[in-house]
UniProtKB/Swiss-Prot annotation:
Family matches, as HAMAP family: Leu_Phe_trans
InterPro entries named among the record's database cross-references: Acyl_CoA_acyltransferase, Leu/Phe-tRNA_Trfase, Leu/Phe-tRNA_Trfase_C
Disulfide links within the chain: none
Protein name: Leucyl/phenylalanyl-tRNA--protein transferase
First-listed, main subcellular location of the protein, grouped into a coarse class: cytoplasm
Protein EC: 2.3.2.6
Name of the encoding gene: aat
Any one GO molecular function term: leucyl-tRNA--protein transferase activity
Reaction(s) catalysed by this chain's protein: N-terminal L-lysyl-[protein] + L-leucyl-tRNA(Leu) = N-terminal L-leucyl-L-lysyl-[protein] + tRNA(Leu) + H(+); N-terminal L-arginyl-[protein] + L-leucyl-tRNA(Leu) = N-terminal L-leucyl-L-arginyl-[protein] + tRNA(Leu) + H(+); L-phenylalanyl-tRNA(Phe) + an N-terminal L-alpha-aminoacyl-[protein] = an N-terminal L-phenylalanyl-L-alpha-aminoacyl-[protein] + tRNA(Phe)
Taxonomic source organism: Gloeothece citriformis (strain PCC 7424)
Any matching Pfam family: Leu_Phe_trans
Family note: Belongs to the L/F-transferase family.
Protein localization: Cytoplasm
Length: 191
């Protein structure tokens, strides 16, 4: 199937997201309960992570190695990121919609977050790490970056225990669409 970039972005702007099922078939999904990462003072992280941040062991980059972040996010026993979806992410990256927010330790990719930025909305697709704390530092630094750029929404799509450590919270689909509309009316740029 050929996926048109404009149609993909329009669907994300309406609250849908792409996922592959267990057979690798790509489809559009939505959720009645959406998970957000707070961009206000509700954002938090473990105190042990503050020590890591203070040590400045990681540097941060955007799109330094976008393909590696895609493959890092997909490289797990059970994944919803198929080869076809990686090709779509690469296409969206080339068009200026998909981004990787990365942490590095020297020349080694430590971790990263893959997402789609549409005006004031950042839709986080996945995250991974190669070095312990790499993705956690990426999360903290991404939130700082989104705040500095005036983003309204950091959509994490689905809740999990890891995201809960950062203060993630759920909202109804109706609330989500109202917030998404507000985010889409903002003129923000990730880079």
């Amino acid at each position: 199937m050929i996926w048109d970039t404009d149609s993909i972005i329009q669907a994300y702007a309406q609250g849908y997201f792409l996922m592959s099922d267990e057979e690798g078939t790509l489809g559009w999904y939505t959720s009645s309960q959406r998970t957000l990462i707070p961009l206000d003072d509700r954002f938090r992280y473990p105190k042990s992570l503050q020590r890591v941040l203070n040590q400045e062991r990681f540097t941060v980059a955007i799109n330094r190695d976008f393909p590696a972040v895609c493959w890092g996010c997909a490289n797990r026993e059970t994944t919803w990121i198929s080869h076809e979806l990686i090709e779509i992410y690469l296409q969206l990256n080339q068009a200026g919609w998909a981004f990787s927010f990365e942490t590095w330790q020297g020349n080694q990719l430590a971790g990263g977050i893959l997402g789609i930025a549409i005006r004031g909305a950042f839709i986080g697709e996945s995250m991974f790490y190669n070095i312990p704390d790499g993705s956690k530092v990426a999360m903290v630094k991404l939130v700082e970056h989104l705040r500095a750029r005036g983003f309204v929404l950091f959509d994490a799509q689905l809740q999990n225990p890891h995201l809960a450590r950062f203060g993630s919270y759920g909202i109804s689909d109706r609330e989500y669409k109202l917030l998404l509309r507000k985010a889409l009316s903002s003129k923000c740029h990730l880079i």
